[in-house]
Regions:
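FMN-binding flavodoxin-like domain, especially the glycine-rich phosphate-binding loop
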Residues: 4, 12-16, 24, 28, ...
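A short, well-structured beta->alpha microelement
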Residues: 28-40
Length: 147
């Protein structure tokens, strides 16, 4: 299966998580990481794994803004896309994991099929966010072989 890992990162946490998940997935899949995702470059028949931190007041990080704005403005039909979201944030903010929640809702609204519920990682409780992300993916990654 082809997998597109779409990364939204400000300080690097989401990128580290994406790198760890790529290492797990590339054993059995064709995986591509997008640090500056452009909608036109993404395979819409692939599984999209979104790894995003939250920036500012619950915002999508700057590097993922063009992708997110494209979705909002163009409303593409994503019914052929399956996806899951890893959201990273700090529960000390009332906008905890806001970017991941917004991305998840937007993809769902555009018809994409959620393969697994969103993982929300609280960096206040998980100083190494890669660890819960790897455990989450390990618990269901074999399902990617049958979808």
């Amino acid at each position: 299966m082809d997998i597109e890992i779409i990364v939204g990162s400000t300080l690097g946490s989401a990128e580290y998580v994406a790198d760890e998940l790529e290492a797990l997935l590339k054993e059995q899949h064709q995986v591509k990481i997008h640090l500056d995702a452009e909608f036109e470059e993404l395979n819409q028949q692939a599984f999209w794994l979104i790894c995003s931190s939250t920036h500012g007041a619950g915002d999508v990080p700057d590097n993922l803004q063009p992708f997110f704005q494209h979705l909002l403005e163009n409303q593409p039909d994503l019914s052929s896309v399956s996806y899951s979201v890893v959201a990273i944030g700090s529960s000390s903010y009332d906008t905890f994991c806001g970017a991941g929640k917004d991305l998840d809702q937007t993809l769902s609204n555009l018809g994409a099929k959620k393969l697994k519920e969103r993982l929300e990682i609280d960096v206040d409780l998980e100083p190494v966010p890669e660890e819960p992300a790897v455990a989450w993916l390990e618990s269901w990654k074999n399902e990617l072989n049958v979808n």
